[in-house]
């Protein structure tokens, strides 16, 4: 027993050689003796022992016929500074456990974290079949199959066909910490050299190792992030087949490093390699993510293709930021006012008034070209969501002088106004109508603006229905044509089954009270059961016809005169007094009258503000000044 403890203590303190060990064993010391759960061999083989002697190890093993071989902690041994490959070979030949996991990693991964691992040791261990990634996981991919039922014909081009979606394992998408990963991330420690030979061997042993990702990033990403970078190491880890998304993540991380580490200099060789032959989509997404003009300019300076084409693609397919446009202009791109605005609108979601304003103010005009190049197509802005309503309204106000056709229709015959009605955008509907949108357009399916308003107001919950009713009043108060009215009446009469809600009578009354202003006889003939209601409406109509300014009644002012001519009436006390009235049925007309008064006041204020002494505008007759501003703003 005494010799057992002496042998253990000598091994524990590393104060032993083969001769003394042999003597103690011959004196009866037992190499299998345990103290605190440790045998002498287990106590001796530790990373704290900087001088593990092979002959001592072999003696402790052979004296008991290698029964204690797994007391030799191979994880501890691989962390020591004096690994003997012949000893490793012997241990492996004698059956030492090499496939175990300790603290979540295997022995090859553990060895990769040491300060100066040897290629021969890697080769010995990997040739024994130890995995290069002890905890590999796989991604998934979506499998899409079209459902075809027996006896049914399906058009494969029909967007309404049914599809079955399933998730399958993607064995090409490998995820986990590899030997290469462990080797790279530990190189940033003091005294830990980065060996090109080690990297080349590991990659040659398993080429796919470069494609493994941990937290969605490759080993190259971590190398550029943590280590002092050498081109030859970069080249060994780099693969042009990495996804464009990952390459841009690597480049972003590399460029940002200059703000994290002092004296870090950008190597243009690395920037060029990461940018070379990359899909511009990823490059532009990277520019958006950086939000730093210095970094964006660094990328653009190394971009070898056309910056002009890059700008066009940017405004066409990406969320646009003004600072990125400015950087492109600084690198030689030319911003065109209408060309780039029209491209900007083509991407769904591009609805930033600040971007539109910047392009309008700073974009160049195309000279000596077709007039269409100097107009803006606003159709791609629609349909819009209510959450973006104010943004779209701001954009429309900015683009107003350049809109090519406010009544442009799509392939279904739907106008911009029609789309805004469907999305219950009250402010957009009002602005469009005030600026010339045609309320009488009929779609290919026979809908009028009035029709869709009535149907949707009848279908939706009260909160939304109120918006459609308000829009209906706005449209009708502009008085549709008799052709539009007849189309609406015919459609609603043919599709009575659509009206199952409780709003249908009140909705029809709203229509009728304006229809009679257009064609009284026709309306009465179509809605004879509403004669009593029509009679009540006539009383308010008569009141509007009785109030006159120089022989012109209020209905004529509101509906028969053009905008500049109306300006002569709106400041008249008779008109302003009438605009203060409260009608039961026609308050929308009163609302329109007050809006005219408000707009007229704005024009008067603007004229006064800009009419300075000796100003050219101030020399014009007041009526001419009113006419100019009326056409521009009323």
UniProtKB/Swiss-Prot annotation:
Induction: Expressed in the early phase of the viral replicative cycle. GO terms for biological process: symbiont-mediated suppression of host innate immune response; symbiont-mediated suppression of host type I interferon-mediated signaling pathway. Keywords: ANK repeat, Early protein, Host-virus interaction, Inhibition of host innate immune response by virus, Repeat, Viral immunoevasion. InterPro entries: Ank_repeat_dom-contain_49, Ankyrin_rpt, Ankyrin_rpt-contain_sf, Pumilio_RNA-bd_rpt. It holds the Pfam family Ank_4. Interacts with components of host SCF complex CUL1 and SKP1 and components of the cullin deneddylation/COP9 signalosome complex subunits COPS7A and COPS7B. This is Ankyrin repeat protein OPG025. The lineage of its organism: Viruses, Varidnaviria, Bamfordvirae, Nucleocytoviricota, Pokkesviricetes. The gene is OPG035.
């Amino acid at each position: 027993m005494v010799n057992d403890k002496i042998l253990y203590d000598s091994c524990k303190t590393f104060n032993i050689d083969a001769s003394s060990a042999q003597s103690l064993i011959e004196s009866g010391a037992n190499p299998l003796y345990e103290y605190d759960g440790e045998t002498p061999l287990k106590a001796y083989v530790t990373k704290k022992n900087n001088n593990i002697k092979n002959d001592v190890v072999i003696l402790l093993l052979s004296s008991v016929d290698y029964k204690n071989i797994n007391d030799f902690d191979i994880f501890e041994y691989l962390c020591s500074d004096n690994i003997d490959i012949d000893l490793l070979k012997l241990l492996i030949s004698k059956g030492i456990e090499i496939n175990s996991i300790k603290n979540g990693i295997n022995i090859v991964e553990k060895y990769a974290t040491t300060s100066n691992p040897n290629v021969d040791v890697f080769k010995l261990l990997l040739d024994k079949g130890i995995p290069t990634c002890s905890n590999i996981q796989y991604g998934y991919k979506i499998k899409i199959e079209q459902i075809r039922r027996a006896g049914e014909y399906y058009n494969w081009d029909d967007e309404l066909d049914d599809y079955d979606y399933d998730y399958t394992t993607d064995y090409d998408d490998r995820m986990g910490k590899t030997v290469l990963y462990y080797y790279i991330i530990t190189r940033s420690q003091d005294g830990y050299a980065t060996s090109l030979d080690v990297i080349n061997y590991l990659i040659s042993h398993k080429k796919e190792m470069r494609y493994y990702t941990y937290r969605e990033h490759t080993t190259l990403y971590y190398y550029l992030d943590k280590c002092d970078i050498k081109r030859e190491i970069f080249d060994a880890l780099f693969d042009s087949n990495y996804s464009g998304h990952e390459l841009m993540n690597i480049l972003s991380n590399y460029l940002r490093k200059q703000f994290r580490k002092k004296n870090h200099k950008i190597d243009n060789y690395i920037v060029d390699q990461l940018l070379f032959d990359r899909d511009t989509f990823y490059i532009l997404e990277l520019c958006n993510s950086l939000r730093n003009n210095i970094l964006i300019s660094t990328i653009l300076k190394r971009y070898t293709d056309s910056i002009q084409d890059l700008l066009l693609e940017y405004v066409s397919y990406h969320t646009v930021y003004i600072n990125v446009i400015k950087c492109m202009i600084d690198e030689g791109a030319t911003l065109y006012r209408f060309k780039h605005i029209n491209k900007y609108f083509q991407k769904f979601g591009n609805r930033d008034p600040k971007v539109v304003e910047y392009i309008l103010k700073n974009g160049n005009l195309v000279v000596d070209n077709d007039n269409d190049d100097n107009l803006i197509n606003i159709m791609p802005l629609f349909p819009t969501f209510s959450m973006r309503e104010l943004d779209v309204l701001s954009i429309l106000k900015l683009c107003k002088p350049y809109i090519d056709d406010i009544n442009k229709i799509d392939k279904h015959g739907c106008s911009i106004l029609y789309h805004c009605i469907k999305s219950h955008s009250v402010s957009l509907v009002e602005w469009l109508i005030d600026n010339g949108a045609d309320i009488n357009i009929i779609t290919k399916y026979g809908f009028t603006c009035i029709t869709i308003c009535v149907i949707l107001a009848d279908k939706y919950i009260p909160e939304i229905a109120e918006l459609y009713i308000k829009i209906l009043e706005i449209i009708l108060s502009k008085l549709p044509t008799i052709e539009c009215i007849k189309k609406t009446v015919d459609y609603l009469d043919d599709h009575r089954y659509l009206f199952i809600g409780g709003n249908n009578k009140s909705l029809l009354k709203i229509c009728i009270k304006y229809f009679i202003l257009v064609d009284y006889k026709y309306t009465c003939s179509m809605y004879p059961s509403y004669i009593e209601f029509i009679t009540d409406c006539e009383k308010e109509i008569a009141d509007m016809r009785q109030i006159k300014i120089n022989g012109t009644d209020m209905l004529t002012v509101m509906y028969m005169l053009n905008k500049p001519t109306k300006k002569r009436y709106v400041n008249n006390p008779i008109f302003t007094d009438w605009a203060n009235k409260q009608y039961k049925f026609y308050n929308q007309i009163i609302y329109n009258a007050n809006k005219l008064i408000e707009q007229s006041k704005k024009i008067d204020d603007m004229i006064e503000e800009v009419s300075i002494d000796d100003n050219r505008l101030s020399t014009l007759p007041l009526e001419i000044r009113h006419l100019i501003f009326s056409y521009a703003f009323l």
